[in-house]
């Protein structure tokens, strides 16, 4: 299963900032929603729990490539865990 998304950066909460790796210029955290054309969201638990990043240089350990994402005219790898 692969996805293509258009990404906008999201803000980390203070709790996430303390426990998660900080994204640099090469890594941008994104919010990803999954749904069908009628607009109802997918309820499959494995999709709801995904945390995804748009990365310039490939996925990190414990992440899997799930497609691509675009910010403006730049293409990134969509890495999810």
Swiss-Prot record:
Covalent S-S links between cysteines: 52-80, 54-69, 59-79
Residues making up the propeptide: 8-46
Matching SUPFAM superfamilies: Defensin-like
Keywords: Antibiotic, Antimicrobial, Defensin, Disulfide bond, Secreted, Signal
Location (main, coarse): secreted
InterPro entries, per database record: Alpha-defensin, Alpha-defensin_C, Alpha-defensin_N, Beta/alpha-defensin_C
Domain of life: Eukaryota
Tissue spec. comment: Paneth cells of the small bowel.
GO cellular component: extracellular space
Start and end residues of each stretch annotated as Disordered: 1-44
GO annotation terms (biological process): defense response to bacterium
The keyword Transcription regulation is annotated on this UniProt entry: no
Cross-referenced PROSITE patterns: DEFENSIN
Localization terms from the record: Secreted
UniProt keyword annotation of Secreted present: yes
Signal peptide: 1-7
PANTHER family: ALPHA-DEFENSIN 1, ALPHA-DEFENSIN 1-RELATED
Similarity comment text for this entry: Belongs to the alpha-defensin family.
Cited function: Probably contributes to the antimicrobial barrier function of the small bowel mucosa.
Record protein name field: Alpha-defensin 8
Organism of provenance: Mus musculus (Mouse)
Lineage of the species this protein comes from: Eukaryota, Metazoa, Chordata, Craniata, Vertebrata
Gene: Defa8
